[in-house]
């Protein structure tokens, strides 16, 4: 019974061992067969990661710039356009004044019209000067007024501070994301790792299967059965006798029965 259990346990272990190596061998061969498909899937995944990183980085950079520019960027663009329109108006006023003066020389235009035109030109020039001062103050202080109220300034400063703080956090997250992304293998590295790993799996599992099968075949061809026990064909008579003596020493009652049976024979 003990011999049967021992042989059965070894058979089960051998069977499951071979099953595991057969699975690994099949997995490795299948993976090598679909190597190009795996490479394409990895490239798509890597491109998706790169795209999402670039989007996140662009957002973080835009956010960082907006912390200093959001309070004046849109105003500055509009002021430039207004200033351009004022300069065009002044140019037209000068042209109109020259035309009036030429008409005045002919006695067709009164001095009152020219004075009204001069007043209009002066108003435009004052507006242009105020606009320049307004824009310069905006570029210098980042606010639309040289003397903003305390409440409005505190609100603006609070918004800028909040945006700056969030921008710092976003930059930190993007930096950590970039470190992780840089540690992800490139497509070339992935192909190398993939090939080496799968070839190793195939070689090791195939080699172990070959060893197990060779061992089983060799054991079967070089063994002989004596009763319930199978011995190697290369075992000597002395080794067999020693083995029997070990069994008899372990079971004294059995030894007496064997000796009695031999005596009767």
Curated annotation (Swiss-Prot):
Q: Which residues cross the membrane?
A: 12-32, 201-221
- Which effects follow disruption of this gene? Not essential, it can be deleted.
Localized where? Cell membrane
Domain of life assignment: Bacteria
Asked if the keyword rRNA-binding belongs to this entry, the reply reads: no
Question: Coiled-coil annotation: which residues?
Answer: 72-141
Write down the InterPro entries for this protein, in alphabetical order.
Answer: MG279/MG280
Where are the stretches annotated Disordered?
Answer: 131-151
Listed A to Z, the keywords are:
Cell membrane, Coiled coil, Membrane, Transmembrane, Transmembrane helix
**Record's GO cellular component, any one?**
plasma membrane
Q: What is its main location?
A: membrane
Q: How does it sit in the membrane?
A: Multi-pass membrane protein
Q: What is this protein called?
A: Uncharacterized protein MG280
Q: Which organism is it from?
A: Mycoplasma genitalium (strain ATCC 33530 / DSM 19775 / NCTC 10195 / G37) (Mycoplasmoides genitalium)
The lineage, from the top, is:
Bacteria, Bacillati, Mycoplasmatota, Mycoplasmoidales, Mycoplasmoidaceae
């Amino acid at each position: 019974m003990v011999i049967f259990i021992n042989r059965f346990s070894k058979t089960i272990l051998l069977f499951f061992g071979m099953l595991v190596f057969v699975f690994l061998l099949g997995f490795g061969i299948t993976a090598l067969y679909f190597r190009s498909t795996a490479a394409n899937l990895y490239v798509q995944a890597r491109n998706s990661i790169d795209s999402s990183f670039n989007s996140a980085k662009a957002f973080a950079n835009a956010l960082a710039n907006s912390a200093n520019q959001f309070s004046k960027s849109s105003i500055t663009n509009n002021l430039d356009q207004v200033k351009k329109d004022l300069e065009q108006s002044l140019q037209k006023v000068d042209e109109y004044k020259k035309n009036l003066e030429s008409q005045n020389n002919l006695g067709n235009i009164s001095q009152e019209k020219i004075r009204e035109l001069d007043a209009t030109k002066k108003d435009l020039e004052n507006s242009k000067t105020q606009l320049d001062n307004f824009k310069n103050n905006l570029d210098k202080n980042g606010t639309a007024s040289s003397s903003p109220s305390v409440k409005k300034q505190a609100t603006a400063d609070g918004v800028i501070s909040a945006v700056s703080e969030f921008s710092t956090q976003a930059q930190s997250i993007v930096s950590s994301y970039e470190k992780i992304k840089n540690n992800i293998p490139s497509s070339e590295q992935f192909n190398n790792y993939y090939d080496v790993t799968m070839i190793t799996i195939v070689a090791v599992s195939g080699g172990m299967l070959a060893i197990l099968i060779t061992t089983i075949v060799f054991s079967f061809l070089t063994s002989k059965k004596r009763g319930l026990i199978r011995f190697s064909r290369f075992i000597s008579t002395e080794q067999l006798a020693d083995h029997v003596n070990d069994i008899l020493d372990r079971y004294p009652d059995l030894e007496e029965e064997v000796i009695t049976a031999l005596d009767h024979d």
